[in-house]
């Protein structure tokens, strides 16, 4: 009991390894403990593969140190109680003889929410919610913010990334913007964010001017779905997004809001928007932005204003991250957060 936080923290770290690779499922981690020692651990790696609890049980069996019988399993999300593409996790827990389950976050899926505790209790397994460190609970909840949004609304969790100068400009008078963010901030918000999201969205002008690949070098299999917003549909046929041979599809839509909703129907759980102010504004003004990540560089551009600002007051919780010579603000829309 006293070490619950220690083992739950390990489960959270394991869960993070699955971010961006489990759609439409959530990223979940699990740790099995017996006699105060970890005897098995695992995380959900991809949809259709073992859930975290099953992966941890199999890991314990392979290690052969101790049987899971009578052990405690720590899970970042309430175990599922109904079979899907794989069996229900509560059945695997019961079959392994695990006697105690500690989970961090209730499953937001109405099909499973609250049902694990009742089912496990009938089998003589104690199931309880983790009551420790509030910061740790927030980390566990943040792991499933995209899943929560998608499973309750059918709409992906949308993150908008913008880079700007101290005077609020995202490019100079000639449209140059690549040099605003530092190398450190590009690594943080580029490769890292692309790796943990299911899809990346940009506008047609980004494709025409920058010809980006929009892939993540650190992403396994490069299965990031690329989305281009173009009202006219006129895009260069030789653009990298169409010719680089990546296994994932490049999708073209004429409207950003429509694209987000269609992506949700396709099972896309999270979308990273790397377009400019116009694309960000089109999503914000219809209430589709969940998270803003703004890179603020220590430069003053002094360019002419570029279009109107985003209308409406943003209702956000804000934090700041130092990143090389720049700093990054991370803003979460409060709606829908527990």
Please state what every model-predicted region is.
Residues 22-36:
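N-terminal glycine-rich anion-binding loops that anchor highly charged ligand groups
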């Amino acid at each position: 009991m006293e070490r619950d936080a220690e083992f739950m923290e390990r489960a959270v770290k394991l869960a993070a390894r699955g971010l961006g690779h489990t759609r439409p499922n959530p990223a979940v981690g699990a740790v099995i403990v017996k006699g105060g020692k970890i005897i098995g651990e695992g995380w959900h790696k991809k949809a259709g593969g073992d859930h975290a609890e099953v992966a941890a049980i199999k890991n314990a069996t392979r290690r052969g140190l101790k049987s899971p019988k009578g052990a405690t399993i720590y899970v970042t999300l309430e175990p599922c109680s109904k079979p899907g593409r794989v069996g229900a996790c509560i059945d695997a827990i019961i079959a392994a003889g695990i006697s105690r389950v500690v989970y961090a976050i209730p499953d937001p899926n109405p099909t499973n929410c609250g049902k694990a505790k009742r089912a496990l209790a009938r089998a003589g397994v104690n199931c309880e919610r983790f009551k420790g460190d509030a910061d740790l609970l927030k980390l566990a909840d943040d792991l499933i913010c995209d899943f929560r949004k998608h499973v309750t609304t059918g709409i992906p969790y949308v993150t908008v990334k913008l880079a700007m100068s101290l005077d609020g400009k995202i490019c100079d008078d000639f449209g140059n913007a690549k040099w605003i963010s530092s190398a450190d901030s590009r690594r943080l918000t580029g490769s890292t964010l692309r790796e943990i999201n299911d899809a990346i969205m940009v506008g047609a002008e980004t494709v025409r001017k920058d010809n980006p690949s929009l892939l993540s070098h650190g992403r396994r299999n490069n299965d990031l779905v690329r989305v281009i917003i173009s009202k006219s549909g006129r895009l260069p046929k030789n653009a990298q997004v169409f010719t680089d041979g990546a296994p994932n599809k490049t999708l073209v839509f004429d409207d950003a809001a429509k694209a987000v909703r269609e992506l949700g129907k396709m099972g896309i759980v999270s979308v990273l928007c790397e377009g400019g102010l116009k694309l960000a504004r089109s999503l914000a003004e219809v209430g589709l932005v969940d998270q803003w990540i703004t890179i603020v560089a220590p430069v003053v551009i002094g360019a002419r204003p570029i279009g109107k600002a985003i209308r409406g007051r943003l209702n956000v919780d804000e934090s700041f991250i130092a990143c090389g010579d720049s700093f990054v603000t991370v803003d979460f829309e409060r709606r829908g957060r527990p």
